[in-house]
UniProtKB/Swiss-Prot annotation:
It is found in: Cytoplasm. PANTHER family: UDP-N-ACETYLENOLPYRUVOYLGLUCOSAMINE REDUCTASE (PTHR21071:SF4). The active site is at residues 172, 245, 342. It comes from Xanthomonas oryzae pv. oryzae (strain MAFF 311018). This is UDP-N-acetylenolpyruvoylglucosamine reductase. GO terms for biological process: cell division; cell wall organization; peptidoglycan biosynthetic process; regulation of cell shape. It is an enzyme of class 1 (oxidoreductase). GO terms for molecular function: FAD binding; UDP-N-acetylmuramate dehydrogenase activity. The keyword Repressor does not apply. Pathway: Cell wall biogenesis; peptidoglycan biosynthesis. Cell wall formation. Residues 24-195 form the FAD-binding PCMH-type domain. Its EC number is 1.3.1.98. Its cofactor is FAD.
Amino acid sequence: MSDTTQVGWQLSEHAPLRALNTFHVEATARWLLSVHTPEALPQALAAPEIADQPLLVLGSGSNVLLAGDPPGCVLCFENRDTAIIAHHADHAIVRAGAGVNWHALVLYSLQQGLSGLENLALIPGTVGACPIQNIGAYGAQVGDFIHVVEAFDRHHQQFVRLDAAACALGYRDSVFKQQPERYLIVAVEFNLPLLCELRLDYAGIREELASMGAELARAADVAQAVINIRQRKLPDPDVLGNAGSFFKNPLLPNEQIAALQASFTDMPVYPGEHAGLGKLSAAWLIEQCGWKGRREGDAGVSPEHALVLVNYGTASGAQLLDFARRIAESVRERYSVILEPEPRIIGAHW
């Protein structure tokens, strides 16, 4: 393996990726570009070895399934600076580099007396990845607090600042997901209130707060409740390879949901993000089809949470992908509902 090191970036050849994805599957990058200072990005991308190569950005690798070796170059941002850049009477603007660990940012915001991100505690990944999927959990989504996304526009070869509207944030969607070849996120600015109405819609959070003796909850209490729940329900990727929730919760027209409920009266339904749509529980659908806790070789579904696909040891990305496809097919056959994966599939098609 040969390395090229310049000010602000490093390029490595034939780099193993097992430690850079939370499924812990084996894969190799032809080139691995590590960028420490975003200002060096244009120079790094012009390196002759990778100038015309496809580019895959990996944060902590918590939202990808490497079903094969990625083509071209893998890019990792190593800028991990966090700071409050503006104070106001009722809110503050926090800027975090793309390489900052997401949960570390949540804890930082709480330590600074800021709220808004507490429901998103312990989500694996980095700040640079959070706008791409518009990450969300327990009734909250990061898009509600994004002020500006700083990115390098590869089409125009310049750095740009995109406000929340320009990011086109939707349910697990954004302009960055729609145009993956265009923008490279280098930092995100968040508009975080000093006091925010707590989102306690999920019964599990209310029950956890009660067990903590925190009926008069603060944002930090909600974060701790979420941490407790996630640690009980979701396996630690450092111990058991996984990427959190593997499937999106399906959004369907209310008419289709009503027809399903007529046949499956115990099917849980939640409000959708838009009028006329409802949301089904992908976990419920998968469990009803008998997949929860099922294991084939080293590929399986967590016995604690039906949405979590796990690698018990040496399953390949291709084996995990085949397992996930069969889960989705069984749900389609029984309910006529199409499940879509949350992680990006690399090296194969869904």
